[in-house]
Structure formats: structure tokens, C-alpha cells
Amino acid sequence: MAEYLIPKSAVVFEEEIKKSRFITYLQHTEGLEQAKAFWAEIKALHPNARHHCWAAVAGRPTDSQQLGFSDDGEPAGTAGKPMLSALQGSQVGEISAVVVRYYGGILLGTGGLVRAYGNGVQQALKLLETERKVERQLFQVHCDYAQLNWIQILCEQHQIEIYQQDFQVQ
């Protein structure tokens, strides 16, 4: 059984850097489709913002097929990538970050953007409450009634949860 941390509740962190307003949202998302839906939800919430950058570790923290990010118009590699790096460093799975930027008229440069987006996610992660997720698999076992006690003992020894029992005659 694999287990890892996931967000328990959503987080919002806001800061101003050189007159630009950065609002970071973190939320539990299971899969990239939910991550993209979360991004669309935040984008609709802030239609006048200049950028809506996102990053997601949408599965287990070690599952590279469930990663995604977007710079949403910022110079390539200055927003989504540092956001994703911060998420991966947290070892939290099933998490998405969206950072909304209201441009304040002062250019931050590529280094400034990398720091602003990455740090926003890091600060939000410090506020994040997590809970442990245990991945489980469902199995169906058919046996004679005479074998039932042996199977129950085996399940107990290996911490296997019996979800349902059906005693039908076959």
C-alpha cells in the first residue's frame, strides 16, 4: 500500500512585489483534469488579472505522468516551472497551485519572476494542512464457508480490511 500526504483544505496566500499583486491558491486536485478545472475556476474569479499561472502534482508525488504547469504568457520557465519545483519539494500529492498576477507596471525580470512565483507557492505551502492518503486495492474473494475463518485470520494478520461479505449459496 502506498501512502502519501494530500491537502486537507485550500490555502490562499497574497503578497505585493514591486507593485504587482500575486495571489497564490493551493487546492486538492485528483488528476490533471481536476487541476485544469481548478485553474479555470480561479481564472474566472480574476478575469482582469494579467496572468493565471499554474502547476500541479495531480497524483502521487512520485508519479511523473501526473505533473503539469503553464507560464500563461510569462517568459518561458519563469512561472510554472518554479511553482512545480516548489510543489515537488513539498512531497505532497494531488495538489495544484494557481498564481494570479495583477501587473503593477514595474518589470521584475526573469529572475524576479522565478523568485516571485516560486516563493508564493512556498509560502502558501507553509500554511497548508495535510492528511495522509492510503491507496487501496479492491479484491473479490470467493471461498467455501469452511475456508472463511482462515481467510479472515489471514486478512487480520496482513491488515486487510474486509469491505463486504456475502454468504450466498452457489
Predicted regions and their residues:
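C-terminal regulatory domains involved in ligand/effector binding and gene-expression control
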Residues: 1-77, 165
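Structural motif
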Residues: 24-25, 52-54, 94-98, 138
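Hydrophobic side chains in well-ordered alpha-helices
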Residues: 35-38, 117, 150-154
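Flexible, glycine/charged-enriched surface loops at secondary-structure junctions
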Residues: 51-53, 128-137, 163-165
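Active-site beta-strand/loop microenvironment that shapes enzyme catalytic pockets
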Residues: 79-127
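Short glycine-/aliphatic-rich beta-strand segments at the starts of folded cytosolic domains
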Residues: 130-145, 170
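Short amphipathic alpha-helix segments
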Residues: 142-162
